[in-house]
Amino acid sequence: MARRYDELPHYPSIADGPAALAGFPEAVPAAPGPYGPHRPPQPLPPGLDSDGLKRDKDEIYGHPLFPLLALVFEKCELATCSPRDGAGAGLGTPRGGDVCSSDSFNEDNTAFAKQVRSERPFFSSNPELDNLMIQAIQVLRFHLLELEKGKMPIDLVIEDRDGGCREDFEDYPASCLSLPDQNNIWIRDHEDSGSVHLGTPGPSSGGLASQSGDNSSDQGVGLDTSVASPSSGGEDEDLDQEPRRNKKRGIFPKVATNIMRAWLFQHLWHPYPSEEQKKQLVQDTGLTILQVNNWFINARRRMVQPMIDQSNRIGQGAAFSPEGQPIGGYTETEPHVAFRPPASVGMSLNLEGEWHYL
C-alpha cells in the first residue's frame, strides 16, 4: 500500500511499438500465415498519438488515488486465485486469507486516507480523471465483496442466519415461544428473507421438510402476525413496529418472492438469470437488480445445492423402481424427492414444494 508511483510497474502501450512488447509473449503478433503478409498499421486517430497516450498514462499513474486503485486490484487478484497460484504469480500467500478480505480493504483505505491527506489532496485538477478513478475503485470494491461472498462457506452463512434468528426470538416473551405452530412460523420467517434453513425444524419433519418448507404460507407475515405485543399500546404500536421489523429482516414482498421462486424452479438446470432475464425480473417484481442478484445467490446456496446433495445421497443409497420412485415407503404428508435414472430424467417442482414428473 505504501508503494509510490515510481515503484509501480509501467506497462507498454500500443504506441510504444513492438520493441516494448517483446517481454510479453502473449502480446507479440503471430508470424504471417498462408493468407499473405499483414497489412501496414493504420495511423492512430488524432489525440491518440504516442505523446498523447504517454501523457494520459502518466496522469493516471500519477493520480493521488492510483495507489489505492492498484491495492484493491491486487486484492481482487488474491481473492480469485488459490495459494499455489498466488505464489506462482509472485503475489505471495495471504496470511489466513485476511489480506484480500473486505475488512482489510477498509483498514487499508483508512490508512491510505491518512497518508494522502498529510501529503497532498485526494483529487487532481482534472475532474474527469478524478471521476474515472473513483468509479474504478468502486467497481473493484464491489467485485471484492462478491468474491468474498462467493468463497464464504455455506455453514458459516447458515450459522449467521441462525444467530440472527435467535436474537429476534429473544426480543419476545418466553410464553410466545411455546406456540404449537412455532416451527412453521420459524420457516416462514426465513423464507421471507429469501433463504431456507437447512436444519431439522422438528422431530416429525421429512427428509426435505427444511428445504421445501411451508411455501404456501403468506409471506411478509411471519412471526409478527402470531405474536401478541407485550405492551398495552394496542394495534397502533404494532403497526409502528412492523415496518421496522420488516426492514431489519429484509423481507421482500410476497408477490416478488413468488415470482423469483417460480423462475428458479423452472430453471433448475441453470438457476441464475442472464442480464436480460434480470431486467425482466426487476420489472416484474419491482425490486432493484442488486436485490434480485442477492436473492438468486442465496437461493442457489440454500435451496438448489441442498436439493442436489439430497438427490446424490438418494441416488447412492436407494434403489429405483421402473416408475422412477425410490423403493421404500413414505407418508403423503412428508415432502419427498423421486428421481429417474439419468437417461430419462424429467421432473418439476411447484410452489408448494411438491415434485411432479413430466
From Swiss-Prot:
Domain MEIS N-terminal: 96-149
GO biological process, one term: positive regulation of transcription by RNA polymerase II
CDD domains named among the record's database cross-references: homeodomain
Disordered as annotated region, ranges: 25-56, 192-251
Major site of localization recorded for this protein: nucleus
Gene3D superfamilies per the UniProt record, alphabetical: Homeodomain-like
Cellular compartments per GO CC: nucleus
Record field: compositional bias (Polar residues): 207-219
Keywords per UniProt: DNA-binding, Homeobox, Nucleus
DNA-binding region(s) from the entry: 245-307
The keyword Phosphoprotein is assigned to this record: no
UniProt name for this protein: Putative homeobox protein Meis3-like 2
Source lineage: Eukaryota, Metazoa, Chordata, Craniata, Vertebrata
